[in-house]
Amino acid sequence: MRIRTAAFTLVGVAAFAASAAAQTTPAPPAIIRTAVAATKLPTVTDVPLYFKAVSVTLAPGATSRASAANGILYQISGSTEVSIGAETKTLGAGEGLFIASGKVASLKAGNAEPSNFLHFLLVPATDLDRPAETAPATVRELYRTVTPIPGLKAGGYDLNLTRITFPAQMPSNPPHHRSGAALYYIVSGTGANTVDGKAEARGPGSLIYEPFGLVHQWGNPGNQPMTFLAFNINPDGVPAVLPGAPVKTQ
């Protein structure tokens, strides 16, 4: 009897373990964040600043020059050799580089195919209409903020570009706001952007501006991952994203 009871006990334990394993829900896919380029700015309050984004195309082997405000290049396809002073770096698809205000960058497309890249800029009003790249580059403006970025404070700021991928069927994240500001560019997939309770689909090529104080949410209801770029500015030592609405000060 004892042997039979022990056998039944072992069978029961095994069945329970199998049932528990079958009921275990796999963890949802994680959000993937990749830092593309970043720098630190000692101040952002000397003059009002704007976001601007342009797309640039260089024919195979063609050269151009970039001399503009603080900004970050992001290579979409092809390759670009970027030379700043004595330093040279070749950008492949998905790579980026910060170019500081006042620096002149020489750009050369690879010989195999055209070079296509984005140039995200943090510019004063005096540079808004200034071409980011010289001929023979084909430059197309994608976006500029109508008014200066609000809420910038004295002190240092982080300026960065991050590539983020939301997994398929990701529910909207909790309401949040930017401590500084950000400009999004949707690379692939379609996300749901919710502001004031209204959700709007945002597909490839969309640009979305998030100034300080804008409470919003992001999700991905689609069956494919959604990848986007976030050109972001936030106070040094403060998270780029903060929960809920900004705390009102007296």
List PLM regions with ranges:
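A short, N-terminal "cap"/entry segment at the start of jelly-roll beta-barrel domains
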Residues: A21-S55, K89-A93, L97-A100, A112-N160, ...
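Short acidic-glycine-tyrosine-enriched beta hairpin
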Residues: A59, G85-G102, D196-L214
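Ligand-binding loop in jelly-roll beta-barrel domains
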Residues: G102-L128, A192, F212-P239
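Glycine- and acidic-residue-biased ligand/ion/polar-headgroup-sensing regions
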Residues: A68-G85, S179-G197
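Bacterial N-terminal signal peptides
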Residues: A7-A17
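Positively charged n-region of N-terminal signal peptides that target proteins for export
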Residues: M1-T5
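Short histidine-centered beta-strand/loop micro-motifs
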Residues: A62-A68, K108-G110, S172-H177, G219-P221
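N-terminal, post-signal-peptide region of Sec/Tat-exported proteins
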Residues: T45-K89
